[in-house]
Amino acid sequence: MSFLTVSRLAPKLLNSKNATYFLVAARNASASSTNLKDVLADLIPKEQTRIKNFKQQYGKTNIGQITVDMVYGGMRGMKGLVYETSVLDPEEGIRFRGYSIPECQKLLPKAPGGEEPLPEGLFWLLVTGQVPTEEQVNWVSKEWAKRAALPSHVVTMLDNFPTNLHPMSQFSAAITALNSESSFARAYSEGVHKSKYWEFIYEDSMDLIAKLPCIAAKIYRNLYREGSSIGAIDSNLDWSHNFTNMLGYSEPQFTELMRLYLTIHSDHEGGNVSAHTSHLVGSALSDPYLSFSAAMNGLAGPLHGLANQEVLVWLTALQKELGGEVSDERMRDYIWNTLKSGRVVPGYGHAVLRKTDPRYTCQREFALKHLPNDPMFKLVAQLYKIVPNVLLEQGRAKNPWPNVDAHSGVLLQYYGMTEMNYYTVLFGVSRALGVLAQLVWSRALGFPLERPKSMSSDGLMTLVGAKSG
């Protein structure tokens, strides 16, 4: 049985008497090397063979139907691409290589004295399908610390941006400028064989992930801390701890929150705008810097990465209108008035999920433990009790439950990060873990240029036998 097979089976067996055997087998199988690239080099040929055999046997098999509504409706529900690192189940929520968020919180290594999973461990899981050892996670931390320094032209660029340029515009531009450092772009121009593409994509991805906290912290300091220095990377600290230090936050609980935040926002299967964008642009053999920069331009859109800001704006308006302690009845009336005015309750509902987002749940658990009496958290908790029932009564929502954005902004505000325009940059730093892990596998498996067929409305009408008049 291959390791990836063991990894896929293990989560399903967590409640069985064989669970311990499979998890120990998974841990032992992954313990052979602390070098992530070496582990990948062992896994890739086996996965290439498995996918090749699958395509040969089932390549012509029909996997679904496409309706006119799907074509006009943003391709919702259309099975159209392969994305290995995570799968979103409408009832269960996200699974990272088969593992749920609670399972990741339990199984992934933590920092000394910490309780939240280290994002380095999640990245190892996303890339390999393996639950890493502490030694492997420490290797990733030190590897990213070693690769973190920014080239001088990117520092100069960031220092010369006007202060009215949005943080996400600065973030995307700086990532694009890092393209000057691309190992893949150089190797491709020198005629490297396509079987080696993944190796250079891996190197670029590791470099980029390592540098993102430095870029993000530099933007934060320039915009909100009078251009003060981000300081130096400490190779003895984990990725999140270095990030919070560079941002200027020393509260250990905030570092723990950042570890949780960067873990749970990392990936949400391949159809969302940022993941699909990186997949699409990468299919043109654009290097990881160009692919990820494009993804960040998608994330900056109000329908994708700005939702937690909208939640905070709505909560602040609610507080201003209703005051401090609010009765459930007044809250219920306010929600109904929001809906009757044609607006939505931000932070509730999801394009795919049909239950409470597990990313919301783990943030709620963090808040219950660390800030149970915070007025804004109490307001969020009260909404959780009331909003779903109101939405069910209204009868329009397919999913009346809260999503990840209903909670994240409140936690960041509590620890003093009140600059809402910056929140999407944090989202972007996290999302790199998932989309770049997938980008490595896309090149390893030889995925081709993405080129779907488009149709005009007249063409669709002709296809289905409808009159165009």
UniProtKB/Swiss-Prot annotation:
Signal peptide: none annotated. It comes from Kajikia audax (Striped marlin). It catalyses: oxaloacetate + acetyl-CoA + H2O = citrate + CoA + H(+). InterPro entries: Citrate_synth-like_lrg_a-sub (IPR016142), Citrate_synth-like_sm_a-sub (IPR016143), Citrate_synthase (IPR002020), Citrate_synthase_AS (IPR019810), Citrate_synthase_euk (IPR010109), Citrate_synthase_sf (IPR036969). Citrate synthase is found in nearly all cells capable of oxidative metabolism. Pathway: Carbohydrate metabolism; tricarboxylic acid cycle; isocitrate from oxaloacetate: step 1/2. It comes from the Eukaryota. Key enzyme of the Krebs tricarboxylic acid cycle which catalyzes the synthesis of citrate from acetyl coenzyme A and oxaloacetate. It is an enzyme of class 2 (transferase). Homodimer. Keywords: Mitochondrion, Transferase, Transit peptide, Tricarboxylic acid cycle. It holds the Pfam family Citrate_synt. Belongs to the citrate synthase family. This is Citrate synthase, mitochondrial. Its EC number is 2.3.3.1. GO terms for molecular function: citrate (Si)-synthase activity; identical protein binding. GO terms for cellular component: mitochondrial matrix. It is found in: Mitochondrion matrix. Residues 1-30 form a transit peptide. Oxaloacetate binds at residues 359, 431, 451. One of its GO terms (biological process) is carbohydrate metabolic process. The active site is at residues 304, 350, 405. The keyword Acetylation does not apply.
